[in-house]
């Protein structure tokens, strides 16, 4: 049964999972992010490392897609992708991005802004060969973001490539790479009762962070 669109405006719930107080904050935003990611993982949230990545094309049109966080440091978020993809084309023209982690089971959201730099090939190469072999193969057979005539074409290319590399190492694709997002700001949102949510934003200032509470 399809949802009755007349009822969409009535879909809502109360957020009762907890609060975020100033005393809960850490000196570095990545410390709080690490705690929240840990809690999301152990709350059995599917794909807790999934993050919505927003980029902008040369006309100013924004695009979004979900990618997976693969590592992070005190200053950076790291992900990997096809360097011929639409997102990579955007990043070549405009390195500014925004990320959003949504962990709605525990009523939390983290929004990050920053700019990207490409990862060195040595680091990309090391990560590529930690991926399952089938995932390595799919990198070769998918010309990401390009129009294809059918799914069958893609699957046939996959099976052919897999057969040809059954007992061989998959070569490293030069068109595949990674990015580090240099964090400029990080906002933490905790859903609250009566829509009185808790929001705190960390904004980079020189070599430190300024922290502000935001109105929901």
Curated annotation (Swiss-Prot):
<feature type="binding site">
    <location>
        <begin position="195"/>
        <end position="197"/>
    </location>
    <ligand>
        <name>substrate</name>
    </ligand>
</feature>
<dbReference type="InterPro" id="IPR011576">
    <property type="entry name" value="Pyridox_Oxase_N"/>
</dbReference>
<feature type="binding site">
    <location>
        <begin position="12"/>
        <end position="15"/>
    </location>
    <ligand>
        <name>substrate</name>
    </ligand>
</feature>
<comment type="pathway">
    <text>Cofactor metabolism; pyridoxal 5'-phosphate salvage; pyridoxal 5'-phosphate from pyridoxamine 5'-phosphate: step 1/1.</text>
</comment>
<dbReference type="InterPro" id="IPR012349">
    <property type="entry name" value="Split_barrel_FMN-bd"/>
</dbReference>
<dbReference type="GO" id="GO:0008615">
    <property type="term" value="P:pyridoxine biosynthetic process"/>
</dbReference>
<feature type="binding site">
    <location>
        <position position="131"/>
    </location>
    <ligand>
        <name>substrate</name>
    </ligand>
</feature>
<feature type="binding site">
    <location>
        <begin position="65"/>
        <end position="70"/>
    </location>
    <ligand>
        <name>FMN</name>
    </ligand>
</feature>
<feature type="binding site">
    <location>
        <begin position="144"/>
        <end position="145"/>
    </location>
    <ligand>
        <name>FMN</name>
    </ligand>
</feature>
<comment type="pathway">
    <text>Cofactor metabolism; pyridoxal 5'-phosphate salvage; pyridoxal 5'-phosphate from pyridoxine 5'-phosphate: step 1/1.</text>
</comment>
<dbReference type="InterPro" id="IPR019576">
    <property type="entry name" value="Pyridoxamine_oxidase_dimer_C"/>
</dbReference>
<feature type="binding site">
    <location>
        <position position="199"/>
    </location>
    <ligand>
        <name>FMN</name>
    </ligand>
</feature>
<protein>
    <recommendedName>
        <fullName>Pyridoxine/pyridoxamine 5'-phosphate oxidase</fullName>
        <ecNumber>1.4.3.5</ecNumber>
    </recommendedName>
</protein>
<feature type="binding site">
    <location>
        <begin position="80"/>
        <end position="81"/>
    </location>
    <ligand>
        <name>FMN</name>
    </ligand>
</feature>
<dbReference type="Pfam" id="PF01243">
    <property type="entry name" value="PNPOx_N"/>
</dbReference>
<dbReference type="InterPro" id="IPR019740">
    <property type="entry name" value="Pyridox_Oxase_CS"/>
</dbReference>
<feature type="binding site">
    <location>
        <position position="70"/>
    </location>
    <ligand>
        <name>substrate</name>
    </ligand>
</feature>
<feature type="binding site">
    <location>
        <position position="127"/>
    </location>
    <ligand>
        <name>substrate</name>
    </ligand>
</feature>
<keyword id="KW-0664">Pyridoxine biosynthesis</keyword>
<feature type="binding site">
    <location>
        <position position="86"/>
    </location>
    <ligand>
        <name>FMN</name>
    </ligand>
</feature>
<comment type="similarity">
    <text>Belongs to the pyridoxamine 5'-phosphate oxidase family.</text>
</comment>
<comment type="function">
    <text>Catalyzes the oxidation of either pyridoxine 5'-phosphate (PNP) or pyridoxamine 5'-phosphate (PMP) into pyridoxal 5'-phosphate (PLP).</text>
</comment>
<comment type="subunit">
    <text>Homodimer.</text>
</comment>
<keyword id="KW-0288">FMN</keyword>
<dbReference type="GO" id="GO:0010181">
    <property type="term" value="F:FMN binding"/>
</dbReference>
<dbReference type="Pfam" id="PF10590">
    <property type="entry name" value="PNP_phzG_C"/>
</dbReference>
<keyword id="KW-0285">Flavoprotein</keyword>
<dbReference type="InterPro" id="IPR000659">
    <property type="entry name" value="Pyridox_Oxase"/>
</dbReference>
<keyword id="KW-0560">Oxidoreductase</keyword>
<dbReference type="GO" id="GO:0004733">
    <property type="term" value="F:pyridoxamine phosphate oxidase activity"/>
</dbReference>
<feature type="binding site">
    <location>
        <position position="109"/>
    </location>
    <ligand>
        <name>FMN</name>
    </ligand>
</feature>
<feature type="binding site">
    <location>
        <position position="189"/>
    </location>
    <ligand>
        <name>FMN</name>
    </ligand>
</feature>
<feature type="binding site">
    <location>
        <position position="87"/>
    </location>
    <ligand>
        <name>FMN</name>
    </ligand>
</feature>
């Amino acid at each position: 049964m399809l949802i009755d669109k007349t009822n969409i405006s009535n879909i809502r719930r109360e957020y009762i999972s907890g609060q975020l107080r100033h005393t809960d904050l850490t000196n570095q935003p990545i410390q709080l992010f690490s705690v929240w990611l840990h809690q999301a993982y152990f709350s059995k949230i599917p794909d807790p490392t999934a993050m919505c990545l927003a980029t902008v094309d040369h006309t100013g049109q924004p695009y979004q897609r979900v990618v997976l966080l693969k590592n992070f440091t005190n200053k950076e978020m790291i992900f990997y992708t096809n360097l011929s993809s639409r997102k990579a084309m955007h990043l070549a023209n405009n390195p500014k991005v925004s990320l959003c982690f949504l962990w709605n089971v525990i009523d939390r959201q983290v929004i990050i802004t920053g700019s990207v730099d490409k990862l060195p090939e040595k680091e990309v190469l090391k990560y590529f060969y930690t991926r399952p072999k089938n995932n390595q193969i799919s990198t070769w057979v998918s010309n990401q973001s390009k129009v294809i005539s059918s799914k069958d074409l893609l699957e046939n290319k996959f099976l052919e490539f897999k057969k040809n590399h059954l007992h061989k190492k998959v070569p490293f694709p030069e068109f595949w790479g990674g990015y580090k997002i240099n964090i400029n700001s990080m906002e933490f949102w905790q859903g609250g009762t009566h829509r009185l949510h808790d929001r705190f934003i960390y904004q980079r200032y020189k070599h430190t962070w300024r922290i502000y509470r935001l109105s929901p």
